[in-house]
Amino acid sequence: MEGERMNAFPSTMMDEELNLWDFLERAAALFGRKEVVSRLHTGEVHRTTYAEVYQRARRLMGGLRALGVGVGDRVATLGFNHFRHLEAYFAVPGMGAVLHTANPRLSPKEIAYILNHAEDKVLLFDPNLLPLVEAIRGELKTVQHFVVMDEKAPEGYLAYEEALGEEADPVRVPERAACGMAYTTGTTGLPKGVVYSHRALVLHSLAASLVDGTALSEKDVVLPVVPMFHVNAWCLPYAATLVGAKQVLPGPRLDPASLVELFDGEGVTFTAGVPTVWLALADYLESTGHRLKTLRRLVVGGSAAPRSLIARFERMGVEVRQGYGLTETSPVVVQNFVKSHLESLSEEEKLTLKAKTGLPIPLVRLRVADEEGRPVPKDGKALGEVQLKGPWITGGYYGNEEATRSALTPDGFFRTGDIAVWDEEGYVEIKDRLKDLIKSGGEWISSVDLENALMGHPKVKEAAVVAIPHPKWQERPLAVVVPRGEKPTPEELNEHLLKAGFAKWQLPDAYVFAEEIPRTSAGKFLKRALREQYKNYYGGA
């Protein structure tokens, strides 16, 4: 088979290497006057253009070279969404180096660990994160230069504007060479490193931008709420640059009022982020009666969007699409849209369809498989693990052979650890993380299904459901609920769940009311902390 492939009939096509720098070069040439708008940490709104970003990215290349950065060296960033971070998104890969977007929401210990593990040579960071950098600076073994992404810097640090050098030419590295890296933000163990190639992120940006995905075009105004330190900001800065769309980068202020000001003031048509941001925005819009002037499409990722959230935004004229991915998958591998022959379904049926995770995007091979790697029936009921193959799926973890071995199946699929069902149309519906499924009396209960149903109750703002040890049933669900105003009674919530189709044995045995639910750095519920806090609640630990 390998021999047949080697002896295949040759094509006449040019062998041009894929490179992220080409996105910015095209945007500067064709859409050079298109704006890139940033809200900085000070609240100031900064305006630039693709032509200026291109020129300054070339100057950043020159400046980094003067600091000793060469092909293959790692350059880390600790920063939110703004124009300087966008310049680094292109300059670092463009010079053949590797952009390591580190997550400032990790603990200082974890940040020091990943910067040392990646052996970063230069650290670019936002000025408001100076206390964090000062706290870990003494622990960093390889960082030689600390650059504050601002006009000025305190003594002992270099200001970004002063670090810019003479314009330098890009370096055309092989398309399979590394261009970026990120570390997982899981709830167990040390973060694991994933290294992205130019080829992976170019193909990912193209596939995710198709009409049945984000459907980005030059006419769009794109505001990524997802941070640029989180899995390439779902590749939106790359994809928006690819098509020449205006970009609005919101900085660290993601409260509803600040977002609405940017949405309306800049004519934003497309945005993307995690459900918690959109739940808060929906509450704000409904309480104020405000209607967004230009927003038309909204992507939800990071965790499942409750059906009620989709319905709320659709009533406001905003189309909501689910997306799914992981750090290990660059990240997007699944996006939701309604197939043409299903458009005749009732609005309720279509809403049910939109609440599913979606369909694998082009070039991604996806299966929902049992423990032996065999696909489970496409009946919408049989549970299996989501397993993936594709040009932007990781084949392992950086410097971690043990984690690499456990992450891959014998036939080379990546094991996500996410449990799902799929139906005859191919729609995937993530039910839970493997570690978050609740096994009660030998039967499985999905915590995600319970959470999404509970958040559809008018008196529930947020809900997290966890498995708690039980002396008789092995595990039973416990729901931690943040009320919306008046606190609902357990009886009200149980009645709501029964009406939603849950059996009595699937209902939580207890409801705990709280002011907030702890979260991971990626905005997901920190269920490990809840399990630890309530482990003795049923007397089964």
Curated annotation (Swiss-Prot):
CDD domains: ttLC_FACS_AlkK_like. Tetradecanoyl-AMP binds at G302, Q322, G323, T327, D418, K435, K439. The keyword Zinc-finger does not apply. Pfam families: AMP-binding, AMP-binding_C. Its EC number is 6.2.1.3. One of its GO terms (molecular function) is long-chain fatty acid-CoA ligase activity. Pathway: Lipid metabolism; fatty acid metabolism. ATP binds at V231, W234, G323, T327, D418, K435, K439, W444. It catalyses: a long-chain fatty acid + ATP + CoA = a long-chain fatty acyl-CoA + AMP + diphosphate; tetradecanoate + ATP + CoA = tetradecanoyl-CoA + AMP + diphosphate; hexadecanoate + ATP + CoA = hexadecanoyl-CoA + AMP + diphosphate. Keywords: ATP-binding, Fatty acid metabolism, Ligase, Lipid metabolism, Magnesium, Metal-binding, Nucleotide-binding. Mg(2+) binds at T184, E328. Its cofactor is Mg(2+). Gene3D superfamilies: 3.30.300.30, N-terminal domain of ligase-like. Upon ATP binding, the fatty acid-binding tunnel gated by the aromatic residue Trp-234 opens to the ATP-binding site. The acylation reaction proceeds in two steps, via the formation of a fatty acyl-AMP intermediate, and is proposed to follow a unidirectional Bi Uni Uni Bi ping-pong mechanism. Catalyzes the esterification of a number of long chain fatty acids with CoA, resulting in the formation of long-chain fatty acyl-CoA. Myristate (C14) is the most efficiently processed fatty acid, followed by palmitate (C16). Also catalyzes the esterification of stearate (C18) and laurate (C12), but at lower efficiency. Does not catalyze the esterification of the unsaturated fatty acids mysteroleic and palmitoleic acids in vitro. Forms a domain swapped homodimer. Belongs to the ATP-dependent AMP-binding enzyme family. PANTHER family: ACYL-ACTIVATING ENZYME (PTHR43859), BUTANOATE--COA LIGASE AAE1-RELATED (PTHR43859:SF4). This is Long-chain-fatty-acid--CoA ligase. It comes from Thermus thermophilus (strain ATCC 27634 / DSM 579 / HB8).
